[in-house]
């Protein structure tokens, strides 16, 4: 029964992941199979640029899932993230005859008007209502209030139309139909953030290979979403500039890399070995890694809108491959001065029952 099986494909900055799950009676999902394909040939910074290769990649993932499930897959959910997305604020104002009582129809009209906004080369993928302003009072639920002016504040999540077209073409080439597209960062937030964190205010930082995604929540509402075109691969490339291949640089990053080292703990005579013959100065290595991770963390903090910077009772939640860098919490604290930082470990974060209904 197809309804029981759910297949999601998530396009990351360095890999495409296919996840097959079975829906349980309580709405939860049991993950049955996970397949990952290297996507460096077809996706750059989360944007499809080679349609044929992406199509081949998708076909390969679907075939592997079919083999594991022994089941025919005809449609998939697609998680979108990466640099094709960004968020913008929008305000819609409606002047009303004096003492009009606001109805839910008026609210729906406001939301529709927001959804019908056009942006050059971009499409609205999702919209989060921030708040309403009734005359001069802010309200989250203004229905039933008398007013002569109603204003809606929205956060629109946009993505590039070209990206959408390329993605559709890639799926057409693989012969799979898209059941629904969803925003990977929102699905991730649903999976890893607690209600208390979203309510009290928090920043979710997803450190990817080529991109870092920042989501800000307050009072249970998404307030900002941004994708920074920097990630773990930038650190690797910087290490490689010390005259070594990227695979060696990646191995050294995992072995020696640290986001923060006390100056007194740096031994000027210590060398880190690349292989049997070659080594690099530990100080140089430490400085290179720190410079880049500091740049990424500063960019992350810069993305947090100033009106929410002091409303983060839930703190900062780190996820993605880059969170495994040693002392990453210390580095974040140095820049943000926020003490509450936790790492969210998860295996497959994609499918939550809200996407599967």
Summary of predicted features, one role per range:
Residues 10, 206, 295, 302, ...:
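Extended, folded domain segments that form the structural surfaces/walls around functional sites
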Residues 342-357:
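Glycine-rich phosphate-binding/hydrolytic loop that grips phosphoryl groups
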Residues 16, 210-215, 325-326:
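Short glycine/serine/threonine-rich phosphate/pyrophosphate-binding segments
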Residues 200-241:
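Glycine-rich phosphate-binding loop of actin/hexokinase-like ATP-binding domains
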Residues 81, 159, 258-260, 311-335:
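Glycine-rich phosphate-binding loops at beta-strand->alpha-helix junctions
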Residues 224-226, 337-344:
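Short hydrophobic/aromatic-enriched beta-strand-loop microsegments
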Residues 1-15, 19-204, 221-223, 232, ...:
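Nucleotide/phosphate-binding catalytic cleft detector across ATP-hydrolyzing
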């Amino acid at each position: 029964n197809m309804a029981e099986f759910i297949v999601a494909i998530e396009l990351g900055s360095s890999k495409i992941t296919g996840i097959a799950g079975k829906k349980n009676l309580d709405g939860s999902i049991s993950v049955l199979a996970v397949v990952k394909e290297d996507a460096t040939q077809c996706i750059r910074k989360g944007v499809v640029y080679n349609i044929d290769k992406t199509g081949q990649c998708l076909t390969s993932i679907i075939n592997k899932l079919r083999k594991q499930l022994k089941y025919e897959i005809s449609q998939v959910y697609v998680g979108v993230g990466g640099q094709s997305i960004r968020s913008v604020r929008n305000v819609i104002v409606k002047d009303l005859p004096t003492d009009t009582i606001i109805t839910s129809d008026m609210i729906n009209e406001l939301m529709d008007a927001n959804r019908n906004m056009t942006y050059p080369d971009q499409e609205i993928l999702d919209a989060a209502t921030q708040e309403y302003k009734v005359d001069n009072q802010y309200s989250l639920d203004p229905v039933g209030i008398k007013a002569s002016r109603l204003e809606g504040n929205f956060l629109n999540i946009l993505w590039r139309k070209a990206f959408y077209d390329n993605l559709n073409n890639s799926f057409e080439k693989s012969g799979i139909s898209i059941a629904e597209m969803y925003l990977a960062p929102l699905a991730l937030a649903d999976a890893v953030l607690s209600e208390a964190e979203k309510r009290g205010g928090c920043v979710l930082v997803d450190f990817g290979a080529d991109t870092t995604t920042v989501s800000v929540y307050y009072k249970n509402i998404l307030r900002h979403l941004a994708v920074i075109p920097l990630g773990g691969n930038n650190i690797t490339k910087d290490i490689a500039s010390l005259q070594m291949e990227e695979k060696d640089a990646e191995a050294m990053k995992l072995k020696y890399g640290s986001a923060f080292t006390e100056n007194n703990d740096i031994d000027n005579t210590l060398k880190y070995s690349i292989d049997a013959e070659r080594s690099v100065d530990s100080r140089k290595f430490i400085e290179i890694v720190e410079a880049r991770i500091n740049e990424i963390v500063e960019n992350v903090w810069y993305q947090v809108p100033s009106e929410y910077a002091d409303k983060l009772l839930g703190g900062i939640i780190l996820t993605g491959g880059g969170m495994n860098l040693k002392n990453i919490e210390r580095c974040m604290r140095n820049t943000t001065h926020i003490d509450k930082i936790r790492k969210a470990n998860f295996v497959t974060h994609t499918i939550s029952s809200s996407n599967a209904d």
